[in-house]
Structures are given as C-alpha cells and as structure tokens.
Amino acid sequence: MSNISSPFGQNEWLVEEMYRKFRDDPSSVDPSWHEFLVDYNPEPTGDSVLAAPASTDGPSAPAPAAPQTAQPALPAQTAPPAQTAQPARPAPQPAAAPGNGASTRPAKPATPPPAEGDELQTLRGAAAAVVKNMSASLEVPTATSVRAIPAKLLIDNRIVINNQLKRTRGGKISFTHLLGYALVQAIKKFPNMNRHYAEIDGKPTAITPAHTNLGLAIDLQGKDGKRSLVVAGIKNCETMRFAQFVTAYEDIVRRARDGKLTAEDFAGVTISLTNPGTIGTVHSVPRLMNGQGAIIGVGAMEYPAEFQGASEERIAELGIGKLITLTSTYDHRIIQGAESGDFLRTIHEMLLSDGFWDDIFRELSIPYLPIRWSTDNPDSIVDKNARVMELIAAYRNRGHLMADIDPLRLDGSRFRSHPDLEILNHGLTLWDLDRVFKVNGFAGAEYKKLRDILGLLRDAYCRHIGVEYTHILDPEQQEWLQQRVETKHVKPTVAEQKFILSKLNAAEAFETFLQTKYVGQKRFSLEGAESVIPMMDAAIDQCAEHGLDEVVIGMPHRGRLNVLANIVGKPYSQIFSEFEGNLNPAQAHGSGDVKYHLGATGVYLQMFGDNDIQVSLTANPSHLEAVDPVLEGLVRAKQDLLDHGADDQGDEKAFSVVPMMLHGDAAFAGQGVVAETLNLTHLPGYRVGGTIHIIVNNQIGFTTAPEHSRSSEYCTDVAKMIGAPIFHVNGDDPEACAWVAKLAVDFRQKFKKDVVIDMLCYRKRGHNEGDDPSMTNPAMYDVVDIKRGVRKSYTEALIGRGDISMKEAEDALRDYQGQLERVFNEVRELEKHGVGPSESVEADQMLPAGLATAVDKALLARIGDAFLALPEGFTAHPRVQPVLEKRREMAYEGKIDWAFAELLALGSLVAGGKLVRLSGQDTRRGTFSQRHSVIIDRNTGEEFTPLQLLATNPDGTPTGGKFLVYDSPLSEYAAVGFEYGYTVGNPDALVLWEAQFGDFVNGAQSIIDEFISSGEAKWGQLSNVVLLLPHGHEGQGPDHTSARIERFLQLWAEGSMTIAMPSTPSNYFHLLRRHALDGIKRPLIVFTPKSMLRNKAAVSDIKDFTEIKFRSVLEEPTYEDGIGDRGKVSRVLLTSGKLYYELVARKNKDNRDDVAIVRIEQLAPLPKRRLGETLDRYPNVREYFWVQEEPANQGAWPRFGLELPELLPDKLTGLKRISRRAMSAPSSGSSKVHAVEQQEIIDTAFA
C-alpha cells in the first residue's frame, strides 16, 4: 500500500474546483489546464489530504503592515517605509490549531446544540476542504524552532538595492525575496530540511527530493470578493542565482494574480514560506501539511516591545534595531530540533554576513559595497561629528571613485569603493545611520541624520555622475559646484524625456541606416556612444539659453557624420551623396578629403525656448587632437571680431562664441598637443572664456586598453593642471549626460573656464567598420556583443516609469527611419557625376594686378613718432631709449633696418584699419632683442605699445585697426595651430607667428602638414597665416641654423603657400603689406634673418618704402642703378637671403665684374617671368650656379635643382650647385668648422 501525499498538497481543493468547472463548461477553464483535467481523477487515494483555501477572515498578502517608526535606511534621497506592502509577499498560512500535533487524533467533543437566533451555514466546497485539511494536519507530529534575528542590516541593504534599481532599470526587491533566497541557500547546508515523510508499502519513508521547490503562499481574491490561498512552487531553486530567483518569484506571483497558473506550478512543493508578519504577527506556528517536511514562518519586523514607546531619537541614541522572528515548524518524524535550530542559525548568520550581501549586490549589478554588520561604537557624539565632517570631505574628494560610470562594468567582480568612503573607516557604523549630526550647512542644513547625509553624498558623487573639483584652488568655484551637485537633481519633464529619446532615436537610426545601406564603408560610427548626441544638444541648448552667439565644434572622425546630421543639421541628402561618391566637380577643386573630415555650418533652434544659435563644425584631419588649437584660435578670432569684451563678472555676452571640443580617451591622455592647448586657457593672448570638452571615452584606443595607454587613473587627469572641473558620466544614462552638459555650460558662463565631461561608453564595432576587435580585446567584446543599446534601455525605462507608451516609442523611431529611407531614395535619383582626376586650386585665387603697397612718407613719420610718444611719467629702460630714438630718426632720414621695416609694415596696416596679431616666443621684444614692440617702464613695469597709437587717426577717430602682440607659451604645435585657426575665424586679419629660431618650427609639423599646406585643397578652408622663421648658417650649431626650407618647398604645390626669403628691409615691408592687402587667403612662409638684423649693409632708403613694391627677383643695386656693365658678366650666381651680402662683399673685394649675383626673393611659387626677364639682361653668361649655405640635400636645391632647369631650359639646363656637402644634420656643431665650410662656399663661387 502506498501513502504518498497528493502532488498538489494544499492546492488540492483548487484542482478539484477547476475539475468541477471543467466538467460543467470546459471553456470556463484556462486552456493550459485542459490536457491535465481530461484524465484527472478527483477521488482521494490512500491518506492523501485535500488542501484548502485559508479562511477569508485571515490576512491578505497585499495588505500593508503597521507602519514602522525610526525606519532604518541606507543613504538615499527618500528611504521608503520598511513595511510597505511588497510584491509577491507570501500570505500567512492557516494558524496552528491548539495541540502538539500528536499523530493520534483526540475524540471529538460533543457539539452543543445551537442557541436560538444562531445562524447556521453548511460548509461546502472550498470551505469544507479547509475543515478537512486542518483536521488532517493534526496527524503530522510537528515541533517548532523560533529565532529572533536583527533586521537592521536587512532593512538598510534593501534600501541600498532599491535606491539603485529606482535609478536604473526600475523594480523593487522585497524582504521576502531576500529571506526566501537565504532560506534556499541554507537548505544547501541542511538538505534534510527539504525532506518529507511518506509511507510506502506500509513502511515509514523519508523522501529527499532531487530539487528544492519553494512554496509561496499567495492570497487571491475571487470575483465574489472572497479570498483564498494557493501555494505555488518556484522549482529548482537551488540552481538559481539571486536575480534568477527574483525573476522566477515574480513570474509565479504575476501568473497567480492573472489566473495563469498551471497544474505544474502546484505540484512538487518541498518546503514552504509563509509570512504572517504582514499583519503584524510577531510569532506564529503554522500547520504543516502532508508532503512537506518544514514550513518557515516570517514574523513582523518590530522593535522589542519595551522600546516601542521610545522616541525615534532615543532609539537611535541607544542603538536599538528592529527584530524579525523566524519560525521553523518541521515534521519531527524526520527532522530533529537541533537540525531545525541550526538551520535558523545559519539563516541568521547569512543575513549578517558579508558574502551573502556581496553575492546579491553583484547579481543585481549594484556597483557599491553593501553595508556591513558591526557593533556600535560607543564614542561620544561630539567626536563622531568630526568624523562625519571628514566623511563629507572624503566623498567630495574621492566620491568619483565610487561612481557607477562604466556602462560595461568590465570588472564585475570589483565593487566601486575606496577606503576613505567606508563609514567603518571613519569610526562610524550602521548604528549611526539614524543619529543626527551637526553638518555646518551641508546641503543647506545645520543638522542631519547620517543616513540622509550618506544619501545626499552618494546621490551627488556616486551614482551615474562622478565629479572631480577639489583640485580647483578657487573656493568660490568649489562652493558653486557643491551647491549644484549636492542639491537633488530635478527630473526632466516628460516632454524633455521624449526629446532626449528622439535624439537617441536619431543617432541610432542614422548609424543603423548607414550600416545597412553602405556595408563595409568606413564611417567611424558612434554606436555605443549615442548619448553624446543628446549631451551636445543639451549643451548647445544651454548656450542658446544664455543668449550666446555661436558654438564652434572641433572633433575627431568618430561620430562625425552623426554630429553633422543630428547636431549641425547638414542635409542627409548631402551626406548620402558623399557616400555615393556623387560629388559635383564644380564644387570639388583640390584633392578633397574623406567624408568624415569635412565641416559644416547650421543654426540650432531651441526645442523648449525661443532662442537660436549658430553652430559650426570645423574640418579636421585624422591626426587626433590636431584640431584643438585650431579651434581655439578660430573662436578667439570670432570673439575679437564681435568685441563684446572679456568681463569676468558674469557678463553673458563676454566670450559669446563657445568652443566645444570632442576627444577620444586615448588621444586626450596620449597626445601632447592636448596639454599644450589646455595651457593656453588662461593666457591673455589666447583666452576664449572656457572650452566645453567632451571626451567620448569608449575605453579603448584602436586596440590598446587603457592600462597600456596611460599612467593615470582617468584619461582626464591632464586637465587638472588648469583647474578645470571634471565630470565623469555613464553614457548609458542620457538624462545624466544632458544634466552634466547644462551644468558645464553654466560653469563656463559663470567663471569663463574650461570644463571637461568624460562620457564613458563603448565602441560597438572595431576601430572602423572593417575591423574585428575581438581578436585583440575578446573579453570586452564578449560584453559589448550582448549589450543592449542605450536607446533600447532608455526606452524601456521610460515605458516602465509610464512616461511614454510602447506605441509612442515605436512610432517615433519608425518615423525617423522612414525619413532617412525617403532621402536615401532621393539621393539615388540625383544627377550622377563622372569621377575624374582632382583639379588644382591654384587658379582659384590669383594675385590682383596693380596692387600698390607703397605708403606716404607722412605715415612713416607718424609711426616713427609713435615710438617716442611715451605716456607722461613713463621711463623707458636706458638700453631701450636709444632704440626708440633711432627709430624716429630712421623714419625721417632713412637707412631703415629690418626690425623697424617690419614695424612700419604692421603699423601702416593698423593705420589702414587692419587687425594685426603678432605672437611667438619672446616676440614682443624679439629673440634677438631687435623688435621692442612693447616698451616696459623701468620703474613701474607698466607697458606701452607704440603701434596701438596707429589705431587712431590724427583727428582722433578710430581707424578700425588693432595691434595685438603677445608672448606665446613655450609651444610650437598649439601656438601655430592657434594662429592658423585665428586666420580661419578672421580671414581679413594679418596674423603672424614667429619662431624663436626657425629650427623649432618642426614642433608644429602636424599643423603645417595637415592645415597650412593642404587645408585649402582638402577642405576649401582658407588661411593667410604668416610664419616668420629665423634662418641662417652662423655657426650656432645644428639646432639654431635651419628653418628647413626644403620641407616647405616639398609641401608647396598648386599655389598652396607663398614661400619667401627677402634680403632687404624694404622688400620684407612690401611682402607683408602685399600679403595683407592682396585678397588672397593663403599662408606666407618667411625665412627671416638673424645676423643680418644688424648688418649695416642690410638697410633700405625711405624711397624704397614710398615708391616701389615687392620684387620677387633682385639684382645687385649697381646693375639696377645703371652703373654696372651686364655685358661683362659670364657667370651668374643665383642665391637667396643673407648669403647675398657675403657673396657681394667678396665680389667687391676681388673686383669681379664677370660675376653677377641674382637674388630669388620668392622661393615659391617661383617667379618664372621675372627670373627669365632678369637673366635675359645678361647676354654673355656661360655658366649659372645656385649658391646656398645649406647642405646639398637641404635648402632650396633639392627642388630648385629639378625645377629651375624645367622652368627656364634655355638658360638653366646646366645649372650647378655650390653648397655644403650633403649632411644628416643642418650644420656642424663647431663654429670653427662652420667658418671653414662657409669660406669654402664663397671661394668656390668665385673660383
């Protein structure tokens, strides 16, 4: 005979009721039951007992418990009441009947007759099953173990968990989730608690199930309002991690509420969990039904009775916590009391252990350390006040190390923490959470509970935004940031949330569209970093809100097309046309560039305001970060044109053009030009009132991981050197990204300083679309490949919060995709243009005829006078005063030297209304103490700039011109890039950058290669920047000799630059004026002299400034004046620069009338016509030489040796070279060797 309990246990009544309904009307029963009920036999067999619903007078699961006082909580903005009704809380099992559960049923007492007036009701169906089950339960011999467990850690860690879930994916963890999971884990150590008793073939048997199936008592309300109890099982619990357990738990409860449970859900429960604590019951002994070995009861969480009348403050002061009572009612036939007691002790220890909570926090992806159990610290409240203030300071300093900012969470085993941020390390414990401490104005309060303090600190510094600002030295800036960061963030309105979603839709749909339509084409997609689009949008919107004039964006190639489309507003048709290779040749002179380097301009209209603002994106090369100084210079030029001033006191219009710079993480940390550019931030000649830096931190540089590409904790650490606040933000939280962007703009406007936003994200594909990143970064891409995109996760969050419906989200995305598809089809139909070789841009800009660069003598005199027009009481340095007097003398009498000729050119342009900007290392005085453009008072240090007087006409009216002269930082890369950018922003200005020595210009080689020499051909970007490069062999060694003429000549093509090496002050004067006035926007490279600055032969007369213009080819004055006889010349020496003076001195010394020296003043473009005409004047020449002091492989010869014979084949086919031998360095390091070599060149020229 078998005596195995029914597989449905307490749910037998429900199965029987379902069977009756099925028998009467099969359609009234869910179809999932049909297959089971067709063969079901409702008759009980053996000793099986029907389970029945609980009395409707019993408590229901959803009913909220009595409110708790002094609810403990972990730091949170609002600590939810601990006993708010939790989802899926098991309802209490029927209360135990009196008695000890003996197996022998006592005799039934006689039933007294009903009194008159009593109402009689015969119990049938489910109610009758209750009677039968309760009577049958008396046959199970039970005993009960009871244990009181501290609930404080359970309460506090649950608050931590739910606060995090509230901010991320939503949902809530109940106490029963945690207790149920702890119960399952304890069963692994005590498998006997999972057994049950049965009689098989008349023999007592203990059955150990293969799995743990936890029964949950669920209270249900019928259509008639009556309540009933079912016990559904979570199957195979022992195999589940916590997240899986919660999912299974919620699934069972949801299906129970919806009437979707199946027969399988009721069968096989091995141990049950009941929760009479929901109605305040502290301790109960539930009945144990056949088929189970134990039922665990959970009592209410209460303070000990003797403290329930105490105040919240007194309870906190005493360190009193709530208790929760667990009972284990077990079948004493197979489970012993010690075993049950140890089982409860294990649950007790587990709920207080670090490992249990660490496991749950990891499973829920909570990046913070759980609160730890500890005993109370008896120190005085005064002593702890100081510790609390230390804790606040620690969060302000180190809170960013705990922030949840990595969307990939690659190190999932590590909690984000720091010893300074743990309350235990400050002598504080969880018992202090509800104590009140003095906080001296923190968050606008004088006193706060530690729980509230921690909640505010974690919300401010440790959620999806990490803030670094304590490195800033200015206390006002620190306080400003604290006030905004430590204040509760206002949640975006639903309209704002929908707008953010629309930007994410646009960003993702754009990338998906290109990936689908242009498979395999490089586009350096933004996938994985789409939140940068709503971030940039929010920043630009805030700039518009401040009434600013323009946002200028500089960025690398990643995401550039998306920014062009969704931020700048470049037409999709144009972008897709470029993908099709469908470029109109009429608009595509020059080499052009790849589609992800091009720039554009648009107008941004506020979505929730009435303002608009200009937005532009500058062109850039693939040289990462090279665009940084260019952008800064471009913005400074625009600001100088607007001339709103530079008010540091909050004037909204000061610095009204905003540079927004996007970076990659590896480049920001790795490229030195970033630090060079940051160093410009506060310098008077370079300040732009703050740049918004956005780092698209995809945590990889091509294939290189951060630990191999930087030595700092963050890629942003370099920005600390300028005191910029740094915000690290999780790219999976677009609302946080938008909030940070607006705060960054507000800070920039308030303090006119740079701000850095470090948006951590990931790169969905390889470095480009043809790359497989899993080859070198497999662990990262195992995570990336299964990660849900930010658009999906944000959409789910909005839907989950009820902000939008699923249909609204789908419609928005579908509309955008349809728009792209329509444009794509239109592009397919556009006129196709044939592809041919690229065309030169040289003819696009031609020198105008008849351009006059001479000036009136009176203007020269005005400029000379300006140098002695010192302010009253101004004392020039005694060594400078003679220089000033000499300049006035030169202005009237002539013999003008190089330095004054330059100042005459610049001053005359200022007088003519030009903005002139001159910068470089030591430029105000001049490397060789030659310029003295700014005079310093010997006594007071005050400054006087004579040429600025030329900005005013003699009648007192302004000319419109300005003279801006600055000493630059010790930088070439950033400094040259800045000046190039300035000319892009103000094409009409004359902008000059001077190298300290021409040798050092190679520090800016990237700018020269990528912008100066090729910007016009690649992007149609025009610049008329001037580089002044001191050059000449004078025995100062290889690093103070050469500006590398050969490199510039190699770069020159299709009129890209003018390269000159003038040899007279007046020709230099006319060269600068021609460059400023000719309307051609192309760079000018001038190789300027050093020793020649003080060469008494290298001077010019006044008439050379007032009567002639720039001459690209010069003969010796003796021939130009008609004194020399050209017919006697049999040898022509072609040369440039200061070497001319050495050659002419030797010629005069030796009386060599047979030798003529012709100077080529303009090296490129070569003046073919003028050179030909000049050489034609010497009819009897038999040999031509190119003479240079540079080595044979350097200087002009490598190009001239090829080009001159082609240019003038009749004369220069046999052109020979006289120079130093080919050398790897520019010169010898010995001045004596230099002298020998120099003399050899001169001797050879006249041999």
Swiss-Prot record:
Documented activity regulation: Alpha-ketoglutarate dehydrogenase and decarboxylase activities are inhibited by unphosphorylated GarA, and allosterically activated by acetyl-CoA, the main substrate of the TCA cycle.
Active site: 332
Pathway(s) where this gene product acts: Carbohydrate metabolism; tricarboxylic acid cycle; succinate from 2-oxoglutarate (transferase route): step 1/2; Carbohydrate metabolism; tricarboxylic acid cycle; succinyl-CoA from 2-oxoglutarate (dehydrogenase route): step 1/1
InterPro entries the record matches: 2-oxoacid_DH_actylTfrase, 2-oxogl_dehyd_N, 2oxoglutarate_DH_E1, CAT-like_dom_sf, DH_E1, KGD_C_sf, ODO-1/KGD_C, THDP-binding
Superkingdom as given in the UniProt entry: Bacteria
The keyword Protein biosynthesis belongs to this UniProt entry's keyword annotation: no
Region (Disordered) residue spans: 23-118
Family matches, as SMART domains: Transket_pyr (SM00861)
GO biological process: tricarboxylic acid cycle
Region of interest called 2-oxoglutarate dehydrogenase E1, C-terminal part, as start-end residue ranges on this chain: 354-1247
UniProt region (Succinyltransferase E2), positions on chain: 105-353
The family this protein is said to belong to: Belongs to the 2-oxoacid dehydrogenase family. Kgd subfamily.
Name of the protein in question: Multifunctional 2-oxoglutarate metabolism enzyme
Record organism: Mycolicibacterium paratuberculosis (strain ATCC BAA-968 / K-10) (Mycobacterium paratuberculosis)
Gene: kgd
